[in-house]
Every structure is written in structure tokens, then in C-alpha cells.
From Swiss-Prot:
Spans annotated as tRNA (mnm(5)s(2)U34)-methyltransferase: 1-225
Protein name, per record: tRNA 5-methylaminomethyl-2-thiouridine biosynthesis bifunctional protein MnmC
One Pfam family cited in the UniProt record for this chain: DAO
GO molecular-function terms, A-Z: oxidoreductase activity, acting on the CH-NH group of donors; tRNA (5-methylaminomethyl-2-thiouridylate)(34)-methyltransferase activity
Length: 613
């Protein structure tokens, strides 16, 4: 992404890109309060959403968060969601320097340093920060990204530079998206009173009021009179807003996808019950002694590769923010010509430090799955029921009752989530959803290689832990055996031969078998279970009508899917959990539409219907 060209002028940050100050150089702090952060009233509701065009140095955000935290909880929303779009990246050290020069640093020190600790690299994406009762989604993209987002703001901060120097931030296209992402009575806050901005706001249903500005003649406020109606050509992927009888959630499965989800749900006040068929944690694919957190490296502009990168960096940031983990990096090796070609196209990617056939991923590293999963469940305060093998459910009067193999019945759940990994194949039976169960075996060796970070080529090698070194993993679609195979251990060892001296003698001290869940297109399957009969009837003519407005999708009930994470569940589970929480709790969706469409459970059927099949 573009980096901001910034200097100090009159002791105030000045943009060389727009030939304008970032804010009022005489009294920026009080102007931000007057125009934006103190110009509206909090509502005592579940979620309050503020959206901003132009994050800049983050002053509006920190002022808003400070006001939110200083307000008595009974007089403010339970959760604050703050979504801010920024196209020009400011370096971490430069941000700190700005606050110090402006003498704002001490006032915001604690919040600012928490923010800077997890500040991402200069790469497009949506990055979430966790503050007390507040989620900040920092969107590093051009403002046109709004057409890819889905939320309904309570308040908009239309910031940015002067309209005559940055007209895109106030033009008709932008105001249409602002209106689309607003609800009745949404308030617009802006320093500008430009006539063309007023005209655009009125065109899309805002009531515009002129009011006294900060140390100037006037500014405007605007309020949306009625929610905008617009045509949706892809309504089959649209969200359905949930209505819940209670806040009880049942999750089937106790692996990493379940653990991250349980933690995220707990932040929203849900009561979570986990049902696991085994007698303890760590018996499935999420129970390895060691593993790696890394990313696929594909060519630029490949959706799967870009999603893998975003999943990876957000997982790394999540584990650092929530579990205080530290990562030392991971080295990926190009072991064939195709991989080398991919590496060569990614030399400008800030996530990958590529040298010849090696890529160093600084945000990656070794993970300890059993410990990580256990810690997340403990933080979530979820109740885990072991030896509960799920069989079926009934959905009546807005609640689920669950039947288990041991004849136990659990009931009164408003939400049911399948997070059972490879076992999903035995419970989900859509015609076009092809799931596969892939066996993987890791090998436990006596320590043989001293490395501070994982190495990944045909197979991976983890650093030594507790006098044990893990390598892996095999890949077998045809074998469903739970027993370790000697030939798999041999294959794992052959696949790491490039890392060893020919005379190295390896001692196998154990192995572990797990099963991965895959979809046919390698994207995870995450979202609401859909009504297959409705889809087949309503969208049967998509071959001819795909460019016309579509009827909104119909889902079957509050049943959600969270599986097909493949071998990278420790990366993808974080975005999956956030997205599911947004669907369940009616929050801003934290993914761009292109990714929502890519992971949607109905995508396979829609592709077929578009072909007229």
C-alpha cells in the first residue's frame, strides 16, 4: 500500500500527498472533539458502530475510545465497534513521534502503546485490535473498499483532507456507500460544509443541518431519514440477521476452530457449551505437540493466497494480543520450480522476506496446539462435555435440542455450530458440497536439529521442545486408520532429507495421527446453514438472471458451519470465529465480500446454478 509522505509544518503533521494539514494546526484536539468525538450521544444498546473515512494518526479513534471508557457502563453501549479506512500508511515510529511532538503522548500513552504493539505492516487488509469492550477494525485500503464491506453505522466520521484536495472522499460514489452502510437516524459528522457534499448527502436521503463550526462560520451535520433500498445482484450470499431466544450456544467439537470461536463468543456475553466425543482435549488434529503458524505463498492477486496471508497475519496478531505469545518466525523453502516461480513473484510482499529459494515469515513461528487450545477454552469459561458423541438435533420454537450417542439429550440452545473438523463429512449432506477427510501423521523424533524457528519444505521441522522434535505431516486421502504407519514415518523423514547431513541418524520415539477436513476448492466452509430447496428453486435461472436483482437468501435455522480448515486451521480459525460472531450477534462483518463469497457454504451450489446445471 501507499506510504504517507508527511512532514511537520507549524508544529503540525502536514501531508505532501494532499498539500494539507492532518487537522487544525492551532487546536486539533479540541476541533476533533467538537466536530466528531463529542458531537453525538451514546445509546444504551448492545453494539454501537462508528465508521470513519480517514484514520490519519488515529486521533479521532483515541478520543472516542477515551470518552467511551470514561462513560459509566450503564450510560453507554456494551460494545463499541470502530471501523476506519486509511489508504496512506504511517510508520509505527513516526506515529509515536507525532504524538510526542504534539504533546498528546502522555494523554493517550497507554492506549497508543497497546495499539502500536500490534500495528501491522504496510499491507492492504482489515486488521482488528482488541481494547476493553471495543473492537477497532483498521482497514488499510482505498476508500473504494466500502463497497466490499457490510455493516450499519450509528455514526459516521467523514474526515480526510479538504474536499477540494481530496474530492474522492466526499463524492457521490462515496456518499452512496455511506448511505448503504447506514440505518435510519445514522448521524454524519464532518468538518466540511461544501455545497457538493450537501447535495450528495441529500440525494441519498440524508437530512442536512447547518450548524456552528469550530472557530469558523459553519459546518454540517446530517441524519439518514430512511434506510436506503438498493439492488443486490448477489443476495444469495447476503447475511440474514439473527433473532435469538437466548444467549446459549452449543459447539460440536473441541479443536482449534471451536476454541477460538468460544473465546470470541465469550467476549460478547454468550454462554457456551462444547461437546467433544473424546475423553479429553488434544485427541484430534488440533492436539499435536508442536506445529507451525505460516501462510501459503501463491502468486499475487490469487484469492486463495491473499486469504491465506490475511488469515495468517490476523492469527499471529490474535495470539499475540490475547495469549501474549511471541513468534520468532518461520522459514518456507521453494522445493520445486512452481514454488520458486511463486516466490519470485512475491519479492515485494512485506510479509515475506525472500532470498533465493527461502522466504522468512517474521510473524510466523512454532505453536503448541494442545496448550494453545486449552488456554483459549479456559479464557472463554466454556463448559466442555467430554465423551459426548453428537448424533442429531431438533429445532423447535427457536431452540435446539441435541441427542448424543450416550442417550444424553441437551436442550435450550439458541445457536448450534458444527466445528467438528473432518467429522463434518458425516453430518452435512448438501448435493454440491464435497468434503474430504484427509489423514495426516506427524513423527516424533529425538532432537536432531537445533533451529530457533520452524523450517518448512516438502515437510516441516519444529524446534525442539521437552526433548522431542516434531516433523510432518503425511497426506493420505485413502486411509482412515487411526493407527500409526511405519511407512508414513519413513516418508516424513525422507521429506526432510534436504535439512540433514547424510550421516545423520534419527531416532523415532513416537507418532500421532489426525484427520484434516478439506473442501473441494481449499477454502474453509464458514457461515449459516442454508435452505437447499429454497436455493434450488429461487436461483434456478441464475444462468440468465445473474446480472439482475436477486431475492434475499433463506437460511434453515441458527445452525452454523465452521470446518474445512485443512492443514492451516490455526491460521484460518481466527477470521472464521470473528465472522461467525458477526453473523450471530448482528455485528459488522469483518471480511471483504470477495472472501465472504469464497467461504460461504452455498458457493458450490451457486457456481453450478450460474452454469445452468
Amino acid at each position: 500500500m501507499k506510504k504517507a509522505k508527511l512532514i511537520f509544518k507549524d508544529n503540525t503533521p502536514f501531508s505532501l500527498d494532499f498539500d494539507d494539514f492532518y487537522f487544525n494546526f492551532k487546536d486539533g484536539l479540541n476541533e476533533s472533539k467538537f466536530v466528531y468525538t463529542h458531537s453525538f450521544e451514546w445509546k444504551n444498546q448492545e453494539n454501537f458502530i462508528i465508521a470513519e473515512s480517514g484514520f490519519g494518526i488515529g486521533l479521532n479513534f483515541f478520543l472516542t475510545l477515551k470518552r467511551f471508557l470514561e462513560t459509566t457502563p450503564s450510560k453507554r453501549p456494551k460494545k463499541l465497534f470502530y471501523i476506519s479506512v486509511e489508504a496512506f500508511y504511517i510508520e509505527k515510529e513516526q506515529l509515536r513521534e507525532i504524538y510526542q511532538k504534539l504533546e498528546f503522548y502522555e494523554e493517550f500513552k497507554e492506549l497508543l502503546e497497546q495499539f502500536l504493539k500490534f500495528y501491522p505492516k504496510a499491507k492492504e487488509g482489515i486488521y482488528r485490535f482488541y481494547f476493553e469492550d471495543c473492537f477497532l477494525d483498521l482497514v488499510f485500503e482505498d476508500i473504494a473498499v466500502l463497497k466490499e464491506l457490510d455493516f450499519k453505522a450509528d455514526v459516521w466520521y467523514l474526515d480526510g483532507f479538504s474536499p477540494n484536495k481530496n474530492s474522492q472522499m466526499f463524492d457521490e460514489n462515496l456518499i452512496f456507500e455511506v448511505a448503504r452502510l447506514s440505518k435510519k437516524n445514522t448521524q454524519i459528522c464532518t468538518f466540511s460544509s461544501a455545497s457538493f457534499l450537501q447535495k450528495n448527502l441529500k440525494k441519498y436521503g440524508f437530512r442536512v443541518e447547518k450548524t456552528k463550526g469550530f472557530r469558523k462560520r459553519e459546518m454540517i451535520k446530517a441524519y439518514l431519514e430512511n434506510e436506503l433500498e438498493f439492488k443486490d445482484k448477489e443476495a444469495y450470499f447476503s447475511r440474514t440477521f439473527s433473532s435469538l431466544k437466548n444467549k446459549k450456544v452449543a459447539i460440536i467439537g473441541a479443536g482449534i476452530s471451536s476454541a477460538v470461536l468460544a473465546y470470541e463468543l465469550s467476549l460478547r456475553g454468550f454462554e457456551i457449551d462444547i461437546f467433544e466425543k473424546h475423553l479429553e482435549l488434544g485427541k484430534g488434529a488440533s492436539g499435536n505437540e508442536s506445529g507451525i503458524l505460516s501462510s501459503l505463498i501463491l502468486k499475487p492477486k490469487v484469492n486463495l493466497g491473499e486469504f491465506s496471508e490475511l488469515s495468517f497475519i490476523e492469527a499471529s496478531r490474535f495470539y499475540r494480543q490475547i495469549l501474549d505469545l511471541e513468534f520468532k518466525g518461520v522459514v518456507e523453502f521453494a522445493h520445486n520450480d512452481l514454488m520458486q516461480e511463486r516466490f519470485d513473484t512475491q519479492r515485494e510482499n512485506v510479509l515475506f522476506k525472500i532470498s533465493k529459494n527461502q522466504a522468512f515469515l517474521e510473524e510466523g513461528g512454532v505453536i503448541f496446539p494442545k496448550k494453545l487450545v486449552k488456554n483459549l477454552f479456559e479464557k472463554s469459561k466454556a463448559c466442555i462435555y467430554f465423551n459426548h458423541e453428537f448424533q442429531a438435533y431438533k429445532f423447535e420454537n427457536g431452540c435446539f435440542s441435541l441427542k448424543f450417542k450416550n442417550d444424553v439429550v441437551k436442550s435450550d440452545y439458541a445457536v448450534l455450530i458444527y466445528a467438528m473438523g473432518a467429522d463434518a463429512k458425516d453430518f452435512v449432506f448438501y448435493d454440491e458440497m464435497k468434503l474430504s477427510k484427509v489423514r495426516g501423521q506427524v513423527t516424533h523424533l529425538k532432537p536432531f536439529l537445533d533451529t530457533p524457528f520452524p523450517l518448512s519444505s516438502k515437510a516441516y521441522i519444529c524446534p525442539v521442545k521437552d526433548d522431542l522434535q516434531v516433523i510432518g505431516a503425511s497426506y493420505d486421502r485413502l486411509n482412515a486408520s487411526l493407527e500409526s504407519k511405519e511407512e508414513d514415518d519413513k516418508q516424513n523423514i525422507e521429506n526432510i532429507a534436504d535439512f540433514m547431513d547424510k550421516n545423520t541418524k534419527l531416532e523415532i520415539i513416537g507418532s500421532k495421527v489426525g484427520f484434516r477436513s478439506y473442501s473441494s476448492d481449499r477454502f474453509m466452509i464458514v457461515g449459516n446453514a442454508y435452505d437447499e430447496a429454497f436455493y434450488k428453486e429461487e436461483y434456478k435461472a441464475l444462468l440468465w438472471t445473474k446480472n439482475k436483482e436477486q431475492k434475499p437468501a433463506k437460511m434453515s435455522c441458527n445452525l452454523y458451519f465452521n470446518f474445512a480448515h485443512g492443514s492451516r486451521g490455526f491460521s484460518t480459525s481466527v477470521l472464521a470465529a470473528r465472522y461467525l460472531c458477526a453473523l450471530i450477534n448482528n455485528e459488522p462483518l469483518c471480511l471483504e465480500k470477495k472472501y465472504i463469497h469464497a467461504i460461504h457454504p452455498a458457493r458450490f451450489l451457486i457456481r453450478k446454478l450460474k452454469k445452468g446445471l
